[in-house]
């Protein structure tokens, strides 16, 4: 799932470029491909709201705002940068490909936008204090540098981390909402300093920092959760309520960590499940990622280890709504990709008639002269698709392709990895820097290739933080002439 992009080694000379493709139903693609924008921090997850900080330290939001999740205090459903002539272009096609002709960007969307506003919305928050932003379905969390957590949006299942007064709260479709960024007082009252936040569809986790270990990784001292617990996705022993409106210690997760004498390496969330990668190479799952596929599939209350991949080290993990992907480094061999979970859109990456598989299986990437000696560098899951980043600027993908988020293929579902077949204009001078996925959106981030010979082969991916000037560009495909797309 998506997240924040920042770069600890900011350079005004180096330009970072974003190329994006996919579903533009709520204006997300348009703003990412607006060439006039200079974004230095971008926040996006598997839902339909986006946030960005520009070079002037202004914080903006755009996308779906039906529950005030954009934190702008307005009740407009959609916010993104466009004008009258552009608005006519956004309602003309059944698929979403972004192309460029002359100086005009053409955007073809999945469905009609409805309400369109003239500019992205500014958020009244001191930008320098923001550490990260995490998005859920209709709500958003903000984490500040001093460890405070703020929330905004819908609160029907306790997503905001506090209770709302029914007499003063805003009501949308019968759901209590808060349109103002509000601090979660639980952490303040208990003097808990939060270092990371992660959202599922309607539940949340907050990790309390402890220190930095010898490998440079953060060791988290405490784990807290709140929100929807109908499917046991909070990792708590207590089972009094369906919904928890205040943070509670995820004691079942802590119990497992203490028993194994290990620490958290990374926590990811899907629509109704949570998944934890530990320092001792375990992958713990709880909740129920398969409920909609098999009503008899039981909820997982106490975290279970699902890592049965032997003689290897898990180096990365990512989660879509109902599937999980990991990179596994085997001793004296290359890194390999494994997937677990739902497969109704081919998101497991290998042909099978099963709609869900509760064990990890290997994904084979087609061997070609281009990738024969290349290793996988990164994986990133969208809601129902996965991107694979390799060396030499190569990208592969599999899963749902209904918005052309994997490539310009006729198939809406790709059950095995296919090469990304869009051409990036003038990419000879660019190095693929990072990949990001949102719900049905794929983003590639490039940086200018360094002139220093010693640095020319550097293609290191910084997963968590990029903080550079972002210029946004357009996409075209290898096999379809530009004028044919437009």
Where are these predicted regions, by residue range?
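Conserved core positions of repeat-based scaffolds
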Residues: 20, 48-52, 61, 139-142, ...
């Amino acid at each position: 799932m998506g997240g924040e992009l920042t770069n600890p080694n900011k350079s005004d000379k180096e330009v970072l470029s974003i190329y994006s493709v996919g579903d533009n139903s709520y204006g997300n693609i348009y703003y990412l491909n607006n060439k006039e924008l200079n974004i230095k921090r971008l926040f996006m997850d598997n839902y339909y709201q986006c946030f960005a900080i520009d070079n002037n330290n202004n914080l903006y939001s755009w996308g779906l705002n039906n529950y005030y999740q954009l934190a702008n205090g307005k009740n407009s459903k959609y916010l993104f940068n466009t004008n009258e002539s552009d608005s006519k272009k956004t309602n003309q096609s059944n698929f979403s490909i972004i192309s460029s002709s002359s100086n005009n960007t053409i955007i073809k969307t999945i469905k009609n936008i409805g309400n369109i506003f003239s500019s992205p919305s500014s958020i009244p928050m001191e930008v320098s204090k923001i550490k990260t932003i995490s998005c859920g379905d209709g709500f958003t969390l903000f984490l500040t540098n001093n460890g405070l957590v703020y929330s905004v949006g819908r609160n029907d299942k306790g997503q905001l981390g506090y209770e709302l007064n029914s007499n003063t709260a805003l009501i949308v479709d019968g759901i209590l909402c808060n349109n103002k960024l509000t601090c979660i007082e639980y952490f303040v009252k208990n003097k808990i300093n939060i270092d990371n936040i992660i959202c599922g569809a309607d539940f949340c986790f907050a990790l309390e920092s402890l220190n930095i270990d010898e490998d440079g990784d953060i060791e988290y001292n405490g784990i807290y959760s709140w929100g929807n617990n109908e499917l046991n996705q909070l990792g708590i022993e207590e089972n009094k309520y369906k919904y928890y409106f205040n943070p509670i210690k995820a004691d079942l997760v802590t119990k497992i960590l203490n028993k194994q004498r290990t620490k958290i390496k990374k926590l990811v969330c899907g629509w109704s499940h949570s998944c934890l990668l530990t320092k001792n190479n375990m992958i713990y799952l709880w909740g129920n990622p398969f409920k909609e596929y098999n009503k008899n599939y039981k909820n997982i209350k106490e975290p279970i280890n699902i890592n049965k991949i032997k003689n290897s080290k898990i180096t990365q993990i990512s989660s879509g709504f109902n599937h999980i992907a990991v990179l596994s480094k085997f001793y004296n061999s290359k890194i390999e990709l494994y997937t677990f979970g739902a497969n109704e859109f081919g998101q497991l990456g290998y042909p099978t008639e099963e709609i869900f598989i509760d064990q990890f299986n290997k994904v084979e990437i087609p061997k070609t002269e281009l990738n024969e000696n290349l290793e996988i560098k990164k994986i990133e899951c969208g809601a129902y698709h996965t991107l694979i980043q390799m060396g030499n600027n190569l990208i592969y993908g599999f899963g749902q392709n209904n918005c052309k988020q994997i490539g310009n293929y006729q198939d809406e579902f790709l059950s095995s990895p296919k090469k990304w077949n869009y051409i990036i204009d003038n990419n000879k001078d660019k190095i693929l820097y990072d990949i990001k996925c949102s719900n049905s959106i794929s983003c590639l981030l490039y940086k200018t290739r360094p002139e220093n010979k010693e640095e020319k082969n550097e293609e290191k991916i910084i997963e968590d933080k990029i903080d550079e000037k972002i210029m946004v560009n357009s996409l075209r495909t290898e096999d379809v002439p530009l004028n044919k797309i437009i």
